[in-house]
Amino acid sequence: SDKGYQGVVIQLYKGFGEVKVQGCQITAQAGALLSQIAAAAREESLTGFEFAGGIPGTLGGAVVMNAGAYGGEMKDVIKEVTVLTREGEIRTLQAEELAMGYRTSAIKEAGYIVLSAVLSLEKGDKEQIKARMQELAGMRSSKQPLQYPSAGSTFKRPEGYFAGKLIMDSGLRGYQVGGAQVSEKH
């Protein structure tokens, strides 16, 4: 917003980005970049997290909003999440307690802060995982202006529609106000 934000923004990034692989599980702190986690999974031949490799952002934010792309979502891989409640209590929530839906979760609704998460993946073929990640990166590049600073995907997809199609149909593709512009790519 041009008017700022009335509240506190907490960014867990440096110092909160540890990623550990144990068997088919990855435990990562909230500040770990999704690309970092995807690379760790690939190196250990773990499949199931390829969809997240090109999503900009950290694990904490991705868990809160159930981030997803190209048919995968965080709810598909989360085993448990450790959070800080509004009362200052540290709790570990199991996947079935998270009520994850399209770009929402019980964590979001409760206003909890994600501290870490355990992801459950499967053994796979390292070369196939690498190829899938490259395929998804190519698809992302063809639909998003990666060479420019971006706020990322802004609109939630209305049920039965794609935001990109609605933007194009409404004539807003390329629309610009000051230095902000709706992408030419969708």
Predicted regions and their residues:
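Gly/Ser/Thr-rich helix-start
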Residues: 1, 8, 32, 54-62, ...
